[in-house]
Amino acid sequence: MGYDSSDDACVYQVSPEVAVIQTVDFFTPIVDDPYLFGQIAAANALSDVYAMGGVPKLAMNLLCVPSCLSLQTVRGILEGGHSKAVEAGCVIAGGHTIQDNEPKYGLCVTGFVHPDRILRNVGALPGDVLVLTKPLGAGILTTALKGDLLSPAARDEVYAHMATLNAKAGQAVLQVEQVHACTDVTGFGLLGHAFEMTQEGSVTIRLHGRALPLMRQARELAEMGVIPSGAYRNQDYVRPHLTLLPGAEQVF
């Protein structure tokens, strides 16, 4: 793997049969519950290995802790992360903790993949079909959480999706021979990640807005203007490469 694309992780081949996938990801809390935060952060970090076609096997905790944070809260975060690692069949073998002004948590993850089965986030070909394995809208809903704008059902839905491993989706991808590009939709949004998929070929991606699966309340909140700041940056990034067809509806 080289430096010419924005792949989800780095890959290093160690033998004709084995390549190592290495990735790291951590962030500040997006939910109040420490255990759930640990689960979400761990699922997010593990996801990059699945997106590359691999299986996570080893991880290290990365934890930033304010001095005011209780031991019970810290334990909850770590136990949440550990629960997702166990579910993934991945061993957390230690980690590193520092004092910081704001709590942050995530994992450095090592996974393995056969060199012939590495998936990249570039290389989409004409005729490919885009498959989404989770509904969209987590960024909008987590922004709404800060203002207490979510119904209990919408809150539970976004919590469940964010804490769900992409393991089953990763396993399904491995059963399909002709997967030309794969990624997990995270910080750059659907449009940003879709644009990346077009970078190693003269292809365009056509999205039908009404066919996209959305989380409960996502559209309603977007129409209210509950938009994370990152969405506007993503919009600016893809705008030169984006064409809205006649009849397409733009919410923001």
Where are these regions (language model features)?
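Glycine- and other small-residue-rich loops at beta-strand/loop junctions that grip anionic moieties
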Residues: 96, 122, 133, 158-162, ...
